[in-house]
């Protein structure tokens, strides 16, 4: 997370508590990479005033990237992007009704002038959003750049050391 001495550089927000089952994968990546982050439920539909306040104060609060996850109508990422210049990465949360395709379409089809970087549906999208946010931050942070490089190497080494899909022999 973050502390007074190490303020959050990234915010992870989601439309409801149930979205945490997906968005926790972004937080896990930040914990591994030691990226200070803030986590909060900000509903586009249930708490619109909170959404506006959050987005309008994002830059002032020191956020350099916002990851917004939402399911269903999934207006959260786009509405945040409309109210801030901080880059927004949208994560479509998989829903029971349409398997997250509805969320994907809501996030990816933004009008010209209000960009949202859209990731994959579900857990992979949440993890990749965190990795992409870390890569953005690493353009001006050599230590984070090295941690990302080490993480990628460990990922590669794990595959090379365990090539048998059946597990240990």
From Swiss-Prot:
GO MF assignments: 5-(carboxyamino)imidazole ribonucleotide mutase activity; identical protein binding
Main enzyme class: isomerase
GO cellular component: cytosol
One Pfam assignment: AIRC
UniProt catalytic activity: 5-carboxyamino-1-(5-phospho-D-ribosyl)imidazole + H(+) = 5-amino-1-(5-phospho-D-ribosyl)imidazole-4-carboxylate
Stored SUPFAM superfamilies: N5-CAIR mutase (phosphoribosylaminoimidazole carboxylase, PurE)
InterPro entries, alphabetized: PurE_ClassI, PurE_dom, PurE_prokaryotes
Keywords: Isomerase, Purine biosynthesis
Gene Ontology biological process: 'de novo' IMP biosynthetic process
Family statement: Belongs to the AIR carboxylase family. Class I subfamily.
PANTHER family (alphabetical): PHOSPHORIBOSYLAMINOIMIDAZOLE CARBOXYLASE, PHOSPHORIBOSYLAMINOIMIDAZOLE CARBOXYLASE CATALYTIC SUBUNIT
Quaternary assembly: Homooctamer.
Function field: Catalyzes the conversion of N5-carboxyaminoimidazole ribonucleotide (N5-CAIR) to 4-carboxy-5-aminoimidazole ribonucleotide (CAIR).
Name of the protein in question: N5-carboxyaminoimidazole ribonucleotide mutase
Encoding gene per record: purE
